[in-house]
Amino acid sequence: MQFINELKDGDVLKSVYHIKTKSQATAKTGKEYFNVQLSDKTGTIDGKIWDVASPGIEDFKAGDFVFVEGDVISYNNQLQVKVQRLRKASNDEFKSEDYFATSKYDKGEMEKELMAFVDSVKNKNYKKLLNAFFVEDEEFKKKFLVHQGAKVVHHSFVSGLIEHTLSTTRLAKKIAENYDDINVDLVVTAALLHDIAKLNEISSYPENDYTDEGQLIGHIVLGYEMVKEKIDKIGGFSEVESVELLHCILSHHGSTEFGSPKLPMLMEAYVVSQADNTDAKLQIMRETIANTKITNKMDQNGFVGNNKFAGTNFRESKLK
């Protein structure tokens, strides 16, 4: 992989890139050509295809992954690619984490932490349920480890879903362990499963958009259905084990205003909803602060301005 931020004038390019834009244009000489914007997780670079009859030019569109051969040149002090040949790439030629913002945490280490949480659950039925998702269903687990946590709002990057899930579970477990009348196994199981239907609600990269069932039903109800189906298939759950876990899934957004069909009516459900909300809000604040530093849009005191998702104006602490 030749990452864009490492390219230099004179480099020969042979690599796969994500096509952000594709358009046809006419030069001052009257010659027609194609403009493409190539991207990976490190940045973007413009490409020029001067041979409009070049093989493969009609085989791809914006949003596709394309294998590009060409020369990196400098034009008006900006690097660009003079494309010689290109073709649509096959799925086994690229990894999405090379092209989109990715969790700063190692995926393998996050997987280990996930399985440690699963192993910590003592309730036999809850452990069977977690194993059914995260051990026995290899395709589900593979997707879960790389899926984004949201389309835009928070953790909207490769492996954002597992990063958010682990953070929520850590918070929820610590809160639950502070009280002797809260069922820690129920809290951990619900926290690990609360957002599993994000896999169905939002399409994976590069599309990163709401699916039809994501728009019409949403991940809360879809998640309820996924967990209920596994519970019924495994069998042997008591009514209390089943109903209380499903309630935690349905109520994890904390209020009907934010999409939960039920308010938290168990201490365990309240813990999960608060942990979920806390991690989401803190991530929104962290991402907003980082972005405003890049764009230099903070005010003189470091405040970022009112944020509709966080619900307030805020700044980073000046204490070090």
Specify the residue positions occupied by each region the protein language model found.
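Divalent metal-coordination and catalytic microenvironments
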Residues: 17, 63, 168, 249, ...
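OB-fold single-stranded nucleic acid-binding module
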Residues: 22-32, 43-46, 52-97
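Short, acidic/hydrophobic/Gly-rich beta-strand patch recurrent on exposed beta strands
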Residues: 35-40, 204
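Extended, charge-rich, solvent-exposed interface segments
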Residues: 80-146, 222
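A short mid-domain helix/strand-loop element embedded in enzyme catalytic domains
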Residues: 127-171, 193-199
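Divalent metal-dependent catalytic cores for phosphoryl transfer on phosphate-bearing substrates
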Residues: 152-154, 163-164, 174-291
